[in-house]
């Protein structure tokens, strides 16, 4: 039977860890310094910096473009070691690339989805394909990043796209309970209550984006103090929490026109589901998309519930194949949660392998 000294010796490492973590969270720089996957800047321009992950200059694996959503830091695909889809793809033999839109300012208020669908994303796809001797590029988009990827592929059938993966991307907005009150009001008022104030300031400011995201994870925010106390001895768990907090705090804002399009065409009009999104004066139909598509929905995602994501299977009537998978996790958890490796990432691995382009290397 252990005496007091024995008990102290047994629990000492745990107590020391808890003390270090408590200090780091309260007075220090956190419990862990986040290490990002090495990357190289390939090209740069306004809201279109393109990075390639990996230390080698010569791309060797199948090209994959990670497309972030609007109003979200591009770090969503590379939060830290263990929470990095980019690192996972790289270690799996792919060559992952990342678009970074940077910060949205008042001067960007006129940027709508067409800026990405007709310009920024196609330019990145062509650049990457050229680096790989013309090989088609696999697109992976989380949330609205998936929306923009799907619209890009639908609008530009000539682009060298191998496949598209949409993670937590809602298609049927009537299946999102959180916005039901807004849709009800919108039947009588249109998008004016949602967009009138943002039009004055040129978009949805970053603080409002950050606050709205926290509201969707209200239970997490309320229970966070208890969560920290219960896990003071678990550095990995706290580091995951900390990486998410930093990610949320770095969310940029929406440009005014894009936010208006989200309200009018996606939330109120449900135009993705009705297969009729209008950008730059012409109609884009998801049914025109021909490449293979993987869609992943989160079982606890309140921003894009399962039913809203699964609706993609009835809309993409022209796609070569449409695969839908359920994965445990919240909206961000689908991409960077503790179960992502064995669910979302595993689905992506299988899908990319099944749809790998034939031409994959350079000299």
Region locations from a protein language model:
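Gly/Ala-rich beta-loop-alpha elbow adjacent to hydrolase catalytic centers
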Residues: 140-145, 149
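Short beta-strand/loop motif that positions the catalytic acidic residue
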Residues: 289, 295-297, 301
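Alpha/beta-hydrolase-fold enzymes
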Residues: 1-7, 130, 134, 149-257
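Catalytic histidine neighborhood in serine/cysteine hydrolases
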Residues: 313-332
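Short, surface-exposed "cap/lid" segments of acyl-processing enzymes
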Residues: 35-105
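Alpha/beta-hydrolase active-site loop
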Residues: 110-131
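Catalytic histidine-centered segment of alpha/beta-hydrolase-like enzymes
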Residues: 328-343
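Conserved alpha/beta-hydrolase "acid-adjacent" motif
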Residues: 302-308
């Amino acid at each position: 039977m252990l005496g007091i000294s024995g008990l102290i010796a047994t629990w000492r490492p745990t107590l020391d860890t808890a003390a270090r973590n408590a200090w780091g969270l309260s007075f220090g720089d956190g419990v862990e310094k986040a290490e990002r996957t090495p990357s190289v800047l390939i090209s740069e321009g306004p809201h279109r910096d393109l990075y390639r992950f990996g230390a080698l200059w010569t791309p060797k694996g199948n090209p994959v473009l990670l497309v972030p959503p609007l109003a979200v830091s591009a770090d969503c695909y590379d939060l830290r070691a263990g929470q990095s889809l980019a690192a996972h793809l790289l270690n799996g033999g792919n060559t992952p690339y990342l678009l970074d839109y940077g910060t949205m300012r008042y001067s960007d208020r006129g940027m709508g989805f067409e800026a990405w669908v007709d310009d920024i994303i196609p330019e990145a796809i062509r650049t990457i394909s050229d680096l790989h001797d013309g090989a088609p590029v696999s697109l992976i988009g989380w949330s609205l990043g998936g929306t923009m990827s799907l619209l890009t592929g639908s609008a530009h059938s000539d682009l060298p796209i191998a496949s598209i993966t949409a993670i937590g991307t809602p298609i049927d907005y009537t299946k999102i309970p959180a916005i039901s009150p807004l849709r009800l009001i919108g039947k009588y008022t249109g998008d004016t209550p949602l967009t009138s104030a943002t039009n004055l300031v040129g978009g949805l400011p970053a603080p409002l984006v950050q606050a709205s995201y926290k509201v969707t994870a209200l239970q997490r925010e309320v229970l966070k103090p208890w969560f920290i106390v219960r896990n003071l001895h678990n550095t990995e768990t706290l580091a995951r929490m900390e990486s998410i907090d930093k990610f949320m705090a770095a969310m940029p804002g929406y440009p005014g026109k894009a936010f208006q399009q989200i309200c009018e065409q996606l939330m109120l009009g449900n135009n993705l589901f009705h297969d009729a999104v209008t950008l730059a004066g012409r109609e884009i139909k998801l049914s025109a998309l021909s490449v293979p598509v993987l869609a992943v929905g989160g079982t606890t995602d309140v921003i894009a519930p399962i039913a809203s994501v699964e609706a993609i299977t009835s809309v993409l009537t022209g796609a070569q194949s449409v695969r839908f998978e359920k994965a445990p996790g919240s909206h961000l958890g689908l991409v960077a949660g503790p179960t992502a490796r064995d669910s979302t990432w595993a689905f992506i691995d299988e899908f990319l392998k099944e749809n790998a382009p034939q031409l994959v290397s350079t000299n």
